[in-house]
Amino acid sequence: QVHLQESGPGAVRPSETLSLTCAVSGDSIRDDYRWTWIRQTPGQGLEYIGYIYGGASKTNYNPSLKSRVTISKDTSKNHFSLRLTSVTATDTAIYFCARYGSLLRRDHYFDSWGQGVLVTVSS
């Protein structure tokens, strides 16, 4: 069974950089999946942030966030990370990591989620 666990600061000041990590157990992040970050802002639906592909270093980002986002992975620690620069109050959200279906099999669903971490942007 795959388990994902987010970690990072609960609060960030405006204009600073948010860094979050998702630890993966029960699977290797080298595997053929898209390791994904998603967020839910207060009172809103889920917003896709981006993913990194386990089979290589291919990334894909939400165009509206692309200029501020970097997703990377550390195979030695079996985790992947999110970096979001120049944060503002609108980046306050619950941030989730998730495993999206196999790219080679063209699976289009999420099969594992972290519990989420609330990040507040405030001075």
Spans of features found by a protein language model:
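Extracellular domains of the immunoglobulin superfamily
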Residues: 1-123
